[in-house]
Amino acid sequence: MNHSNQMHHDNHESHNHHSGHAHHHGNFKVKFFVSLIFAIPIILLSPLMGVNLPFQFTFPGSEWVVLILSTILFFYGGKPFLSGGKDEIATKKPGMMTLVALGISVAYIYSLYAFYMNNFSSATGHTMDFFWELATLILIMLLGHWIEMNAVGNAGDALKKMAELLPNSAIKVMDNGQREEVKISDIMTDDIVEVKAGESIPTDGIIVQGQTSIDESLVTGESKKVQKNQNDNVIGGSINGSGTIQVKVTAVGEDGYLSQVMGLVNQAQNDKSSAELLSDKVAGYLFYFAVSVGVISFIVWMLIQNDVDFALERLVTVLVIACPHALGLAIPLVTARSTSIGAHNGLIIKNRESVEIAQHIDYVMMDKTGTLTEGNFSVNHYESFKNDLSNDTILSLFASLESQSNHPLAISIVDFAKSKNVSFTNPQDVNNIPGVGLEGLIHNKTYKITNVSYLDQHGFEYDNDLFIKLAQQGNSISYLIEDQQVIGMIAQGDQIKESSKQMVADLLSRNITPVMLTGDNNEVAHAVAKELGISDVHAQLMPEDKESIIKDYQSNGNKVMMVGDGINDAPSLIRADIGIAIGAGTDVAVDSGDIILVKSNPSDIIHFLTLSNNTMRKMVQNLWWGAGYNIVAVPLAAGILAFIGLILSPAIGAILMSLSTVIVAINAFTLKLK
């Protein structure tokens, strides 16, 4: 599938520390096996690091065979490193490719000189060549990079799997009722597609016929199958369960959920965090450090031993053993793995800095409705306070105004009125009163739906005892006003989510204080907070109040994470150190929010914190390994322990260098969410 291939390609390109590297990763496997054919005769016909074995695979003119094969190997097998080094120098960011290119170039050029001295010069004595080292160096480098690229690819494997979820074709239901198999790219918005049991749903859409259960585990991380009926949304890439359904297409191509997720993740992987910028800088300095140590070691050994072969071997070993690459990949590989795992589990990381900031969070502020509670209200009590209006008339007036709103409280009232067969009308001039409720005209009379705060602020009389009784039972209470008089009320209960209590306990165990922010009344807020174990509660808030509360907490030096609705809580999410938009569903492109939680599950807040902790731990491990390896390996390669007989050959240096990067990649791949 084209999309999948493009995503896979982008994943590699994002590691721009090794641009020369990325251009050639597809060739490493082929180049390794072709180079092996050239390298075997070179290795057999060359003295092993200057040591003559009891048996020799040589014949008259064999040195010419070695020269010709080494030249082919240098330009063919060494091409990724030579052109990669050239790219790095062109961008003024010399790194690992440049070091390897320098190492094999020095080995090859000096070997040409040795060949000339041994075959055409009248000078006595044998000049040692480096053709054996050159062949083994190039082979080991190609093998190491092939293994590494597999590991790098696996780091973003979850994302690649997501890209492969969409099928290549779909069954389109034509206007005449005929079915026709068409390519996914030919599907348009508003087309009807048919999906049989067990098939992958080709696009985002709405079920227009049939009912089924859907497996969304690979798309949103939702482990249980989700029951879907007519008018329910489905996500492209999820698996249809038991029934055949017809789906009206709502989004295709880049507008689809999966494409948006992969786009956001790719963007996050390409953005550099402060830790990554630092490691890039250190990796850049490492090139100059390695070249300097290599040149100094060459000069020092020439002065000590006056042996150009040994001194040159030290120089080449230093150049090939230094690995800025291990340092350069330390963070991007963990990031690729982390963001992919997150996306696979319905946690979209938009801002990578938030993963680092999450280690220092002091407070998590949460909206009550929909975050801590289900947001599925049930009407528990409704009452008229006016003798000439029945209770059902009050319900009808509430439902008329609320029919124009998509707030959970409004939807609950309208559904309840329908279930009671209470009719209601379409109101005129309905306006939202921010943080309070609604107002509008019904039969040319103005009605307002408000909360208790509004009544208190404006001096309205109401039954306070009834309010306290219902509120302490956990009800949200709305009042209906006509002609400056409270004429009725409605009380709605909400259920606390099962996972909320565990989430609060987990936060407290991490020394993070949970804070409830809600527009609901004090009594309801404290009743819910008490049940959950939250002691810090702010109730009866206007939308702008939440932002100022976050600002107050931050002014004392605290780091604040805000969890809320990506649209209604946008200012608060932007103000917080980390903004988490919860329950985004397929609308993952919400502008506000550093992290987007597809589901409305509070336990995903803990999953994000766990993923952040695990990610940072892997980053630190990789940085220590990347830096520590170079601190130890470069002086060893220079011959600092030669006096006790510990000398590393260029081939051993190349093996260690390749291993160092592979270890970083494997460590990144072991990152888990749990």
Curated annotation (Swiss-Prot):
Binding site for Mg(2+): 565, 569
Catalytic activity of the protein: Cu(+)(in) + ATP + H2O = Cu(+)(out) + ADP + phosphate + H(+)
Pfam families: E1-E2_ATPase, Hydrolase
CDD domains: P-type_ATPase_Cu-like (cd07552)
GO biological process: copper ion homeostasis
InterPro entries tied to this protein: ATPase_P-typ_cyto_dom_N, ATPase_P-typ_P_site, ATPase_P-typ_TM_dom_sf, ATPase_P-typ_transduc_dom_A_sf, HAD-like_sf, HAD_sf, P-typ_ATPase_IB, P_typ_ATPase
Spans annotated as Disordered: 1-22
Compartment(s) where it occurs, according to its Swiss-Prot or TrEMBL record: Cell membrane
Entry superkingdom: Bacteria
Compositional bias segments (type: Basic and acidic residues): 7-16
Keywords from the named record: ATP-binding, Cell membrane, Copper, Copper transport, Ion transport, Magnesium, Membrane, Metal-binding, Nucleotide-binding, Phosphoprotein, Translocase, Transmembrane, Transmembrane helix, Transport
Keyword Transport applies: yes
Membrane topology of the entry: Multi-pass membrane protein
Top EC class, one word: translocase
Main location: membrane
Segments passing through the bilayer: 32-52, 57-77, 95-115, 127-147, 284-304, 315-335, 623-645, 649-671
EC numbers on record: 7.2.2.8
GO cellular component: plasma membrane
Active site (catalytic residues): 367
One term of GO molecular function: P-type divalent copper transporter activity
Record NCBIfam families: ATPase-IB1_Cu, ATPase-IB_hvy, ATPase_P-type
PANTHER family: ATP7, ISOFORM B, P-TYPE CU(+) TRANSPORTER
Function according to Swiss-Prot or TrEMBL: Involved in copper transport.
Record-stated family: Belongs to the cation transport ATPase (P-type) (TC 3.A.3) family. Type IB subfamily.
Record-given protein name: Probable copper-transporting P-type ATPase B
Organism: Staphylococcus epidermidis (strain ATCC 35984 / DSM 28319 / BCRC 17069 / CCUG 31568 / BM 3577 / RP62A)
